[in-house]
Amino acid sequence: MSIQVLSDVLISQIAAGEVVERPAAALKEILENSLDAGATAIDVELEQGGVKRIRVSDDGVGIPRDELALALTRHATSKIATLADLEQVASLGFRGEALASIASVARVRLTSRHAGSDHAWTIHVDGGPLQPSSPAARSGGTTIDIEDMFFNTPARRKFLKTEATEYAHCAETVRRLALAWPQVAFTLVHNGRAQLRLKAEAAAARVRHVLGEVFEQHAIAVDAAAGALRLSGWVVRPVAATASRDAQHVFVNGRYVRDKLIVHALREAYRDVLHHQLNPAYCLFVELPPEHVDVNVHPAKTEIRFRDSRGVHQFLYHAVERLLAAPVAPAAPPSGPDARPPTFLQPRQAAMSLQVEEAMAFYAPFAAMAPGEGDEARHVPQASAAGLAGRAGPPRAFASDSSAVPPLGYALGQLHGVYVLAQNAHGLVLVDMHAAHERVVYEKLKTALDRRAVPAQALLIPVALTADPREVAEIAPHLDQLREIGFELSITSPNSVAVRAVPSLLKNADPVELTRAILAEIAEFGVARLLAERRNELLATLACHGAVRAHRTLSVPEMNALLREMEATERAGQCNHGRPTWFQLRLDELDAMFMRGR
């Protein structure tokens, strides 16, 4: 075949392969045009998942009669005129090819009444040349009616999924834009049935209506800025993470994006508090000058490039990481005429005779080195002044003034040697003592290593253990580096090692188990990588071995010491594996269980 110039229709059909891969993509382009036109109310009607019909009506400024044909012409746009405009584009659309691409693979009717016009005008195209415009009746704004998607490209139509799947993609498109534009009312109708009605409202209310009550209940508000860069929105506490990524929404200057850099920054921010098989949920809005971000990467405009990608990554990571690190206070108590102040009781278990091997000595290293004390470089958010008062002291009688009670309250006792039960101002607190202590030890190890001052506890008698010759050979050149994290080892033979000292924070752990854990990590990753790239993973492993074990009986003073440590520890709401360390059971929830007040 000889070289020839393609027809405009074929060119548009080829371009449609990138811009309009499914009905949801066409819907996205039309909705963005409505938002760019200043619409305050948008109505969407779908038939057969958008394959049979997509109809979008808005109350925007409308299109003048003499520009209707241009709106359906390739590379015709009102958004930009020069390269300088492209570099500072603030509108959602700007390429001028979406409507032309849609019109090349579907039957399109465009009806619009421009502000100040006596009546509306309409123009239509059936996958070929434009038809002349004619008068029409409608109020101010624009209606775009798309029918028979891919009617003239049957090969493309075969790649579409079921009606339910295509509708789900369309509905998700509407919800995403509704999140970014809460000041705009949206309605969605599918096959004649209303599916979504959102009035113009505040951003928080829109998030609740779109993402649901579970998201709202576990959401933490984000508001951070650095120069011209700003981050706002909500991230969800790790305890509400799921295996799905469906609840991850990021908008840059009002545009929904799927950016690997942003996803990586947020994943890293959650890494220390989230199980590796779960995914965080968030709805975040990034704002920065238009010239600092390139949105002209792909015709679909969901991929972007930042001028200072490293700076954006660091900003997002630190903003979310600091937020997740702050101790989370218990939920606010119920208010209203039925609410009643809590009555605090003296815990009785303090008088019981308990068999505790180490008593308070187990927590002595923690009292001597609390997180953040004397460490100006590492900021530890404080739970409250009351929460840190008298941390090392014995339990006292609960005051009638709930404001004097620490956030996690005071211990009442233990359940099956696994859970600590405590009473605070809001009701009952249940603590997984191993998971909670594991986080406390982990954070203290990180703080000590950051200071390059991990205190070591020498063993009275060195402990010898056999090891694989390859493991022994691997650690031989790195004994000094291991000493930096509190381990003093000596090689006694090609297949044996003597443990002479362990980190003092882990002095109650089994030195053989600790050393074998170290050797296993070294065998898999090597010492250099382990201490550089996987430092936190190593410390998490050590903390797990060093934490108080389940089924060990604690005294009330020990339980209270653990509660105070949790209140002063970053990320105390999750263990090193992302599991929750404590739950709050409010008094009104207990009343509901026993049907009190009914």
From Swiss-Prot:
Gene name of the encoded protein: mutL
PROSITE patterns reported in the protein's UniProt record: DNA_MISMATCH_REPAIR_1 (PS00058)
Pfam families, per the entry: DNA_mis_repair, HATPase_c_3, MutL_C
UniProt entry tagged with the keyword Aminoacyl-tRNA synthetase: no
InterPro entries reported in the protein's UniProt record: DNA_mismatch_repair_CS, DNA_mismatch_repair_MutL, DNA_mismatch_S5_2-like, HATPase_C_sf, MutL/Mlh/PMS, MutL/Mlh/Pms-like, MutL_C, MutL_C_dimsub
UniProt keyword terms in alphabetical order: DNA damage, DNA repair
Presence of keyword Lipid biosynthesis: no
General function of this protein: This protein is involved in the repair of mismatches in DNA. It is required for dam-dependent methyl-directed DNA mismatch repair. May act as a 'molecular matchmaker', a protein that promotes the formation of a stable complex between two or more DNA-binding proteins in an ATP-dependent manner without itself being part of a final effector complex.
Any GO molecular function: ATP binding
SMART domains, per the entry: DNA_mis_repair, MutL_C
PANTHER family: DNA MISMATCH REPAIR PROTEIN MLH, PMS, MUTL (PTHR10073), DNA MISMATCH REPAIR PROTEIN MLH1 (PTHR10073:SF12)
Gene3D superfamilies found in the cross-reference section: 3.30.230.10, Histidine kinase-like ATPase, C-terminal domain (3.30.565.10), MutL, C-terminal domain, dimerisation subdomain (3.30.1540.20), MutL, C-terminal domain, regulatory subdomain (3.30.1370.100)
HAMAP family documented for this protein: DNA_mis_repair
GO CC entries: mismatch repair complex
Entry similarity comment: Belongs to the DNA mismatch repair MutL/HexB family.
Gene Ontology BP term (one): mismatch repair
Protein name from the UniProt record: DNA mismatch repair protein MutL
Organism lineage string: Bacteria, Pseudomonadati, Pseudomonadota, Betaproteobacteria, Nitrosomonadales
